[in-house]
Amino acid sequence: MQSVSDIRQYFIDELAAENFVTDKTGVKTIELVGASFHADEPTIFGKLNDDYIKRELAWYKSKSLNVNDIPGKTPEIWKMVADKDGYINSNYGWCIWSDEIDSSDTVMRNKGRHNRGQYWRVYNELSNNRDSRRAVMIYTRPTMHEDYNRNGMSDFMCTNAVQYLIRDDVLNVIVQMRSNDVVFGYRNDFAWQDYVASLLENALRCDGRKIIWNVGSLHVYERHFSLVE
């Protein structure tokens, strides 16, 4: 299986060869389609922002679907994807811990929008059967095709699901994403997934954890080409 080092080298080589994909806005990207690798490092390019990681984790724990509730200054990227009132879809804490209907939208509430306690479903499944293949936290939902742009937002959830398998007492975490930005996206998402994995590892008394990262489109934006080294 490939490692973060292999993925890093892929992007370095693609940049040197000027193999770019141009998106709908005319911006160049370097893209790896169908990426799959052992997430054995917390960052691919660039340095960790521990302060932001802590603030985002606190927001995830709050399960708030409003970006104005992020502690400290709200990052511009969250403001850009939120609706006019600050609401988004992608609070990952809400995705796995919420057992409630989203009260921010009465239309969606009437449709029964909730995520039904994904974390506890996985915990209970593996507590009852450590060999199970059914321990999956489902992040996105079929209505995302309509939800992503409701009320002016632009937030089509990037994480599809995460599967957890215990083998030889090691917790294997298989992350499945539709899209992931190599620079900021990966390192912040890794920090979140590693945190959740650590909770399960301890709760289920596993002997270590391993994260496998699967992404439909793993990419570097043109503005970050200078970090590819």
Question: Where are the language model's segments positioned?
Answer:
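Terminal, non-catalytic protein-protein interaction segments that mediate quaternary/complex assembly
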Residues: M1-E229
